[in-house]
Amino acid sequence: MCGDCVEKEYPNRGTTCLENGSFLLNFAGCAVCSKRDFMLITNRSLKEEDGEEIVTYDHLCKNCHHVVARHEYTFSIMDEFQEYTMLCLLCGKAEDTISILPDDPRQMTLLF
């Protein structure tokens, strides 16, 4: 992966977990051909392991096919929550947890 192609390595994206696409605002331009254009997504794979979905793919420069970053996105269900994570040199790191129940138990107030 190429740290010279990005503005910031692994930027913190909060809860924004991308299953596909590219975070072009963080793309400084290709360190090999010096062009700043759209990215190609290649080598996309989806694996399921122990109830967890793992999506991986490579971000490539559209012009010279230089590998800019490797993207990993995971999805799983733990108890009553959907959990998402993303880790990518270009797109950043993020995680999110969402309740699958109609009322999120984390946001319920205690009644005394």
From Swiss-Prot:
Belongs to the Churchill family. Keywords: Activator, Developmental protein, Metal-binding, Transcription, Transcription regulation, Zinc. Pfam families: Churchill. GO terms for cellular component: nucleus. This is Protein Churchill. Disulfide bonds: none annotated. It comes from the Eukaryota. Zn(2+) 2 binds at residues 30, 33, 61, 64. It comes from Mus musculus. GO terms for molecular function: DNA binding; zinc ion binding. Zn(2+) 3 binds at residues 59, 71, 88, 91. Transcriptional activator that mediates FGF signaling during neural development. Plays a role in the regulation of cell movement. Does not bind DNA by itself. GO terms for biological process: mesoderm development; positive regulation of transcription by RNA polymerase II. Zn(2+) 1 binds at residues 2, 5, 30, 66. InterPro entries: Churchill_sf, Transcrpt_activator_Churchill.
